Amino acid sequence: QIKTIFLADGESSRSMKIKKLKKNIELREKQALKVAKKSGFLEPVFKRLPDNSLDTVPFLKIAQLIEKEINKYKPTTIFTHFENDLNIDHQLVYKAVITATRPLSKTFVKQIYCFETPSSTEFNFTKRQNKLFNPNLFLDVSKFIDKKKRILKVYKNELRKWPHARSLKSIKNLAAFRGSQIGVKFAEAFIVLREVR
């Protein structure tokens, strides 16, 4: 079973009136619920922290929110953001996940992976190789690419027109590029942070 946690509201960093902000947050959450249902996931959790402003929230609070959800659902595998995404919220969520999953004797989290986020992961321009997203795990998604595109269409407010990185064409192109790295049509790439066997 898969459970997603949305820590930030995803909207409050965009200037708008309170009524419109509330409506947009509710729409975003409705879309996420629809995606979860279509994908066979458990109902997602929404924490509604301020968007693109997690650096204004005490770090301990973020880590404790994540730790509470981990203790509640007891996942063996966690997927989180890449530590060097351009988005400050992604950076802090990564650090909070690492903090919340520190390897204590009774931990049940055996695998932690970082995923790439179009329009955030690739926008962190740096010459330092150790700061780039260099995947070491690839999953063949050739059989699921059309389903992924259908599900992504539910997130109407997040998708953009080509050539934006969050356009359907760009997302499919990224999957094709990752697939070409392992000799398949389409793939998704990850960084292994922890894998206990």
Region locations from a protein language model:
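Conserved SAM-binding loop
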Residues: 32-36
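Metal-dependent de-N-acetylase/amidase catalytic core
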Residues: 23, 37, 42-43, 52-197
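ATP-dependent adenylation/pyrophosphate-handling site
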Residues: 1-21
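N-terminal Rossmann-like or analogous alpha/beta NTP/dinucleotide-binding catalytic cores
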Residues: 23-31
